From Swiss-Prot:
Subunit details: Fourteen ClpP subunits assemble into 2 heptameric rings which stack back to back to give a disk-like structure with a central cavity, resembling the structure of eukaryotic proteasomes.
Keyword check for Ligase: no
Main EC class the enzyme belongs to: hydrolase
Protein source organism: Idiomarina loihiensis (strain ATCC BAA-735 / DSM 15497 / L2-TR)
Chief site of localization: cytoplasm
Protein name, as recorded: ATP-dependent Clp protease proteolytic subunit
PROSITE patterns in the record: CLP_PROTEASE_HIS (PS00382), CLP_PROTEASE_SER (PS00381)
GO cellular component, one term: cytoplasm
Length: 206
C-alpha cells in the first residue's frame, strides 16, 4: 500500500540567516556549507544525486581551483555509473577532494571514499565501511543475458583494479574481499588503505 502523503519533516531543510552590509540574507544549510566548500553525498547514489554533486564540484573548481573540497559521505551505495560520474569528476578537477565517512560508506559509497585525495581520506570514529562486487539484475533473452553478464564481469574487474590502486592492496586480495560483503570499522579501514585517518574531534586526527 502506498500513499501520496509525505512527512513534511522529511522535506524540512534548515535555513541560516546572515547579516550583511545590505541587510539579512538567508541560505538553506546546504548552500551555506557549499560556500565553505563542503558537499554531501548522502543516501542512495543515483543519477540525480550524481548530477548535483558533479555540478557542485565543477562550481567549486571554478570558484577556486587551488583550495580543497570536502565530500562528506553517508551512503549505502547505489548505481555504479552514477558513482563513476562523481569519481571521474573528483579526479578530473584541479582541487584535492578530501573525503569523510560519517555513518556508513558502503558499496559505491566506499569506492568514492577511497577515491579521495591521498592523505586526505577520513572516517569518523563509529562509521562503517563495506566493499563488495557490483550487483546486477537483468531479464530478457538468453543472448542479451550473456552480453550483460560479460559487462558485469568486466566492470567487476575494473572496479577491483581501481580499488586496489587506491588502497595499495594486491588485486587478488581485493578480488577475494569483494567477492562477498566485507565490512570494516574505522580502524580496519585505515589498515586496509581505504582511509588515511580517523577524525575524533575538530583538529584532532588519529
Amino acid at each position: 500500500m502506498s500513499s501520496d502523503i509525505q512527512d513534511p519533516m522529511a522535506q524540512l531543510v534548515p535555513m541560516v540567516v546572515e547579516q550583511t552590509s545590505k541587510g539579512e540574507r538567508s541560505y538553506d544549510i546546504y548552500s551555506r556549507l557549499l560556500k565553505e566548500r563542503v558537499i554531501f553525498c548522502c543516501g542512495q547514489v543515483e543519477d540525480h544525486m550524481a548530477n548535483l554533486i558533479v555540478a557542485q564540484l565543477l562550481f567549486l573548481e571554478s570558484d577556486n581551483p587551488d583550495k580543497d573540497i570536502y565530500l562528506y559521505i553517508n551512503s549505502p551505495g547505489g548505481v555504479v555509473t552514477a558513482g563513476m560520474a562523481i569519481y571521474d569528476t573528483m579526479r578530473f578537477i584541479k582541487p584535492d577532494v578530501s573525503t569523510v565517512c560519517m555513518g556508513q560508506a558502503a558499496s559505491m559509497g566506499a569506492f568514492l571514499l577511497a577515491g579521495g585525495a591521498q592523505g586526505k581520506r577520513y572516517c569518523l570514529p563509529n562509521s562503517r565501511v563495506m566493499i563488495h562486487q557490483p550487483l546486477g539484475g537483468f531479464q530478457g533473452q538468453a543472448s542479451d543475458f550473456e552480453i550483460h553478464a560479460k559487462q558485469i564481469l568486466d566492470l567487476k574487474e575494473r572496479l577491483n583494479r581501481m580499488l586496489a590502486e587506491n588502497t595499495g592492496q594486491d588485486y587478488e586480495k581485493v578480488a577475494r574481499d569483494t567477492d562477498r560483503d566485507h565490512f570494516l570499522s574505522a580502524e580496519e579501514s585505515i589498515d586496509y588503505g581505504l582511509v588515511d585517518g580517523i577524525l575524533r574531534q575538530r583538529g584532532e586526527e588519529s
